[in-house]
């Protein structure tokens, strides 16, 4: 929280996004409270990152954390969310970044018919869009 305030004060031309950090729901709630006490209304922010999610995203606890802040009106961004996370709580997030599609294409040597690039589709926009569609419609 202090870093965000410093960055916004010294580099106001950059659209810095606050990030909630924690391990358990109570930790994230404390972080949310610290932002509020510093005058940062997270519900008014265009995007709020949710940290410490990757590698734990298939747990019910992460789902509860996402749902808590989604219900509070926060526009959430998930860092490093894998397909399980997209399927479980992606509908509650404004944006997600993920390398899961790229890792899967590389590991499984996936190559879509008709692709003109060399090698598997791990850097292929077409495959990324196919992966996204499959992940969002399951």
What is the role of each PLM region?
Residues 1-72:
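Conserved alpha/beta-domain cores
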Residues 50-53, 79-83:
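Glycine-rich beta-strand-to-loop/alpha-helix junction loops that act as flexible
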Residues 9, 37, 64-76, 83-138:
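Alpha/beta catalytic cores of nucleotide-metabolism and tRNA/nucleoside-modifying enzymes
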């Amino acid at each position: 929280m202090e870093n965000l305030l410093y960055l916004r004060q010294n580099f106001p031309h950059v659209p810095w996004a606050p990030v909630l950090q924690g391990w358990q729901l109570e930790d994230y709630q404390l972080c949310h409270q610290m932002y509020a006490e510093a005058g940062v209304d997270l519900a008014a922010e265009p995007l709020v990152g949710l940290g410490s999610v990757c590698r734990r995203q298939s747990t019910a606890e992460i789902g509860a954390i996402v749902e808590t802040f989604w219900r509070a009106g926060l526009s959430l961004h998930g860092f490093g969310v894998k397909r399980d996370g997209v399927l479980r709580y992606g509908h509650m997030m404004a944006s997600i970044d993920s390398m899961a599609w790229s890792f899967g294409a590389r590991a499984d040597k996936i190559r879509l018919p008709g692709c003109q690039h060399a090698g598997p589709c791990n850097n292929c926009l077409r495959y990324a869009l196919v992966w996204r569609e499959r992940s969002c419609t399951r």
